[in-house]
Amino acid sequence: CEYSSALISFNISPLTELYCIFVEFIQAIILKIYTYKIMNNVIVSPHYLSTSIGSKVFEMGGNAIDAAIATNLIQGIVAPETCGIGGDLFALIWIPGEKEPHYLDSAGFAGSGVNADDLKNFNTIPLNHPMSVTVPGAIAGWHELSQKFGKIDINDILNLGIELCHNGFEISEELHQSLTHHLDELSGQPSGYPFYRNDQALDVGYKIRRVQLGRTLELLANNGLMSFYSGEIGKAISESVDNVLTLNDLESFTSTWRKPLYSNIY
């Protein structure tokens, strides 16, 4: 969850990268909030690297939208227990001088391989089942926000994430706790391998590099954000969930601008 002067976005991943447990997501926000002010702009996020690296976007000539995308990107790298590129995105944007805010809905839908009869067999959302995965809307949301309101090239933002993935960062207390709590679910999954050693979560302060995620971001920088939903990445996503999400499901997804609900309370 990232806040800026112009954007609020929630990016929650049900399965891809790491599971986001909503209670822990809220706890992370309550426990630590990192604020950075540069000129007339303020960035607030749950992780100091998300805030500090996001602030660089202003120095690069970007606006609040660019900075919010960057903050969201970095948060998914350093705190995958809160969000990531496998999640969705909702944005509420108020442009100075305009009468009402813009609302972007970039939440993905269930795959065409899911039907109501199949879901009746579950009492709760099955976190370890492909049918719990919906089309990831976050990347499409970044694309739409950047195209409509962004000021700098999206690749300049992606490069900040690529650099961090390859240079590495230290495991935070919050990430360590989440990894420990979900050891049984995550340690045996490919996306979880880098975070564990000898069946134990990496210690606080351990420096980790997210090389595979960096390569994914490089593909997006080379081929465009929407290539996430097609080609090499799209096929890999579909295959990883046993084609419950088809390539057509991914390629047909688009973000939607909607009229926001509001009420006068004073």
Please place each PLM-identified region on the residue numbering.
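Low-acidity, Ser/Thr- and Arg-rich intrinsically disordered low-complexity segments
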Residues: 1-16, 20
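Alpha-helical protein-protein interaction elements
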Residues: 2-5, 26, 187-188, 220-221
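Generic low-complexity segments that are intrinsically disordered, proline-rich and/or Lys/Arg-biased
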Residues: 15, 28-29, 102
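Short, Lys/Arg-enriched N-terminal segments with co-localized hydrophobic residues
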Residues: 26-38
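Noncatalytic scaffold domains of N-terminal-nucleophile
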Residues: 36-59, 64-230, 234-266
